[in-house]
Amino acid sequence: MHFAFGCLHVPVADGCEVQVSMADDQPAWVTVVRGDSGLQLQAFAAPKRDGLWAEVRQEIAAEVAKAGGQSEEADGPFGVEVHARIAPPEPVPGMPGGLHPVRFLGVDGPRWFLRGVISGPAALRPEIAAPLEQVFADVVVVRGDHPVPPRDMLEIRLPAEALQALADEAEAQEENRWGGLEPFQRGPEITETR
């Protein structure tokens, strides 16, 4: 069974939680969380003839170095990947300060490119990474037939159940907004006498 997030169909894995991160009120990436580790997923349009992963690896290495981190290429279960140590944009609860390990995975498909980022203990320990690697291997990218410029992110959409849950949550927040007060009902009055 897979959860359909538009272009990404993400498998349901035991012990994993699936989260969708938003940017500018739009779904930006899907993260599969297992324990203290995570796998961030994004799919991009790619040219018909060439893949993107070789170029993207070089760009990742340059960005990591520019941010004061370290990176190196290594062979992994999906081919060449980038092992990096980066400073998180903000402190991570329960993690020591300094550079944190991450693994960048990439797969070129027909007119699409799938990028995965493994973080947390799974970035260093293969036995912890194995379930997340299996999720990455089982992701289905639905490119669609419409034209999308190379390197543009393919559209991630929330499943209908998630949209309904968000609508229900927004409605509950609106109902609780006044904390039990009726905004159009007269409240306590104070009279000043001089």
Describe every region a protein language model picked out.
Residues 117-163:
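Surface-exposed amphipathic alpha-helical segments
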Residues 81, 148-184:
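Short, highly charged C-terminal tails/helix-capping segments
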Residues 49, 71-76, 117-121, 145-151, ...:
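Short C-terminal domain-edge/linker segments immediately following a structured domain
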Residues 64-66, 137-139, 150, 172-173:
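Short, intrinsically disordered/low-complexity patches at protein termini
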Residues 101-106:
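Hydrophobic/aromatic beta-strand elements that line small-molecule binding cavities or substrate pockets
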